[in-house]
């Protein structure tokens, strides 16, 4: 279903970009959001620069865009309903920046979470680890590897950007995550690099909650295992510390 949605999305973007490009050639610029307001048909019909035969085919292309948009909205609604009724997706969506589309994509691509022995394994699986460039005695870190599922990676980075904007406006309720973001901001990290770093952290969080089988618990987040109550220690795997798992107590719904 995720593959079908991605195909609809590609076809919609391609059709809309083609429509926009043809209209611009005839001196009829189309701004963002015009498609949703149903003004394109009016703009094309009232234009005196475009010949009638061109108008007819532009309206056909416009109708194709609308049909693709309806299909995309329909399948997105289905995925949201599926995520709302799925236990694993519910746990994944407890992470800030992850909504139903991202959650269902991650569930489909992760498979068995036990195959990721370390947090870095799942980050590398989605291509969010930096490239290592070694020459002689020097070793440098480059951009991310961009391996794995491209759609899931782009959704995670998009979600990370939303979380960063919420944190900048003071709307993010997670104190541990706010502290982490503030620490990275003090390093004057570029926006794109910060989004990738936060997306990687979100993946580590997803791995932790799926292995433990629980959602976030803000009360015990950021605390060493030895200092937890005895009834809470069983939720921690081995000798790992929950300090590796920031524990937001809210979720942000985005695609």
What is each PLM-predicted segment?
Residues 137, 141, 177-255:
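Low-complexity, acidic/Ser/Thr- and charged residue-rich accessory regions of DNA metabolism proteins
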Residues 58-62, 82-85, 96, 142-146, ...:
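Conserved phosphate/pyrophosphate-binding and hydrolysis machinery centered on Walker-type P-loop NTPases
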Residues 91-94, 100, 106-187, 191:
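Phosphate-backbone recognition surface of nucleic-acid-processing proteins
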Residues 11-18, 102, 118, 152, ...:
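Residue-level detector of well-ordered alpha-helical segments, enriched
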Residues 1-91, 220-223:
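Glycine-rich, often acidic, oxyanion-interacting loops/wings at catalytic, nucleic-acid
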Residues 15-16, 73-76, 112-115, 162-171, ...:
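Short helix-capping/linker segments at secondary-structure and domain boundaries
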Residues 22, 71, 75-78, 109, ...:
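Generic, well-ordered alpha-helical scaffold segments in large soluble proteins
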């Amino acid at each position: 279903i995720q593959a079908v949605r991605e195909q609809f999305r590609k076809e919609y973007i391609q059709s809309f970009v083609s429509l926009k490009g043809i209209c611009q050639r005839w001196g009829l610029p189309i701004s963002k959001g015009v498609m949703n307001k149903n003004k394109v048909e009016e703009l094309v019909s009232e234009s005196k620069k475009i010949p009638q035969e061109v108008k007819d085919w532009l309206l056909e292309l416009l109708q194709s865009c609308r049909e693709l948009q309806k299909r995309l909205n329909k399948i997105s609604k289905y995925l949201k309903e599926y995520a709302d009724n799925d236990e694993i997706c519910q746990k994944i969506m407890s992470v800030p920046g992850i909504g139903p589309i991202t959650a269902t994509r991650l569930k489909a691509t992760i498979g068995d979470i036990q195959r990721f022995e370390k947090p870095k394994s799942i980050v590398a699986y989605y291509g969010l680890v930096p490239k290592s460039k070694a020459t002689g005695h020097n070793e440098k870190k480059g951009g991310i590897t961009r391996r794995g599922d491209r759609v899931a990676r782009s959704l995670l980075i998009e979600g990370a950007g939303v979380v960063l904007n919420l944190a900048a406006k003071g709307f993010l309720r997670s104190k541990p995550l706010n502290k982490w973001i503030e620490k990275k901001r003090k390093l004057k990290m570029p926006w794109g690099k910060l989004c990738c770093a936060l997306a990687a952290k979100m993946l580590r969080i997803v791995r932790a909650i799926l292995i433990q089988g629980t959602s976030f618990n803000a009360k015990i987040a950021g605390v060493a295992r030895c200092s937890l109550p005895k009834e809470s220690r069983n939720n921690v795997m081995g000798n790992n510390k929950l300090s590796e798992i920031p524990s937001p107590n809210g979720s942000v719904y985005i695609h």
